[in-house]
Structure formats: C-alpha cells, structure tokens
Curated annotation (Swiss-Prot):
Signal peptide: none annotated. The keyword Isomerase does not apply. The gene is pyrF. One of its GO terms (cellular component) is cytosol. GO terms for biological process: 'de novo' pyrimidine nucleobase biosynthetic process; 'de novo' UMP biosynthetic process. Its EC number is 4.1.1.23. Catalyzes the decarboxylation of orotidine 5'-monophosphate (OMP) to uridine 5'-monophosphate (UMP). The lineage of its organism: Archaea, Methanobacteriati, Methanobacteriota, Stenosarchaea group, Methanomicrobia. PANTHER family: OROTIDINE 5'-PHOSPHATE DECARBOXYLASE. Belongs to the OMP decarboxylase family. Type 1 subfamily. This is Orotidine 5'-phosphate decarboxylase. Homodimer.
C-alpha cells in the first residue's frame, strides 16, 4: 500500500449506496478503504469489486480458523479484488502461514491483529501481543494491527517488528485515539471510521485528520 495520506477509512456502513457515496467523497484523502462484515454481509463481496474502482480495499474479516478454511476465505477475498486482509494470529502459525501463502500468490497483503483498540482488547491480547507480532514477522506478513487508543503499545510493537512490517492503527476518533499521537508512536497508517462516515461532511472530516498528521 502506497503511503500517501496515511489514512484508511473504516467503511462500517451497511448499504451499497451510502458506502459508494462516502468512498467517493473521501477518495482524495484516503490510501485505502477497510470493509468488514457489516457491509459485506449486507451487500455481498460484490461491493469490494465496486470499491476497488475508488481505492484499494482491505478486507477486515479478522480471519481466525483452521488453515484450510483460512485459505478459502483469503482466496474469495482476493478474487474479489481486495488488496489486503486482516487476520488474527492467535490461531497459530499454520493458520497464518496459510493466509500469507495465498496473499503471496495474489501479490496482496496480510495484516495480523496484535492487540485490539477497545477496552476489552487488553484482557486476553496483552500477554500475547508481542508473541503475535514476532510471529507475523517470521511468517512474512505485510503488517500488523495495533491500537491507536494505546500509543505506548504501538511503540512496543514497533520495537519488535522493526521496519520490516507496517503498522495500521484503529481507534482514532470515536474510540478516543489521536492520529498525530499514534503516528508519532510508530504507526504507518491510522484507521478511522465513525468520525468520518457519520460526519455531515465526510471529506472535511477526512481532510481534518490528514491535516492533523501533516500529510
């Protein structure tokens, strides 16, 4: 993913018309659009094929299954045109290897969750986040997901992965994270959803976040 604006839109709306409208409005300010279950369950994977005409798409399915099932999920996502997928790492190295193998075949990216951004994200992830980050490096993943709500954790993860992997960081805006703070902590991109798509002017909201990061 080309680092231009350092902003990823989390497009967690549920209908096609709204999704395409917002995506088009913010296209000048985002490097990628992240879609998850709310939109894909509502509109099907075909929405990915439409969104990739606007910006690269990351499928946030937090893939977490046995290797064969993970492989099938990744193949469907990448065949739909997604440029990347988000997976969990707690299912182990063989499951992650399966995702990375498919991504390598398609020339796409895998981002591994190290620690989630909501308060409950520390309950079980905190003790294993560093191990997951190390595994992501060893498996050849493209990057990791680390919380903008806890910039100190982004610093910790960056120390482990070095400059080999990218960090994409959710939790800016509605969850309380600061885009500028987490970029300073070592994130490559921030992921922002509600603060943009619930705004009266998504483009202005996206521009404001970009300005905060001086991008």
């Amino acid at each position: 993913m080309e680092k231009k604006n350092r902003l990823i839109l989390a497009l967690d709306v549920t209908d096609r018309e709204n999704a395409l409208r917002i995506a088009n409005e913010v296209s000048d300010y985002v490097d990628s659009i992240k879609v998850g279950y709310p939109l894909v369950l509502g509109e099907g994977l075909s929405i990915v094929k439409e969104l990739v005409e606007i910006a690269p798409v990351i499928a946030d399915f937090k893939v977490a299954d046995i290797p064969n099932t993970d492989r099938l999920i990744c193949e469907h996502v990448f065949n739909a045109g997604a440029a990347g997928i988000i997976t969990h790492g707690f299912t182990g190295r063989d499951s992650l290897d399966s995702c990375v193998k498919v991504a390598n075949e398609f020339g796409t990216d895998v981002y591994v969750v190290t620690e989630m951004s909501h308060p409950g994200g520390v309950e079980f992830f905190r003790p294993v986040a560093e191990d997951i980050a190390s595994m992501a490096v060893e498996a050849g993943a493209s990057g990791v997901v680390a919380p903008a709500t806890r910039p100190e954790r982004v610093k910790d993860i960056r120390k482990i992965i070095g400059e080999e992997l990218s960090i994409i960081s959710p939790g800016v805006g509605a969850q309380g994270g600061s885009a500028a703070d987490v970029i300073r902590a070592g994130a490559d991109w921030v992921i922002v959803g509600r603060s943009i798509y619930n705004s009266d002017s998504p483009a202005e909201a996206a521009k404001k976040i970009c300005d905060e990061m001086n991008c």
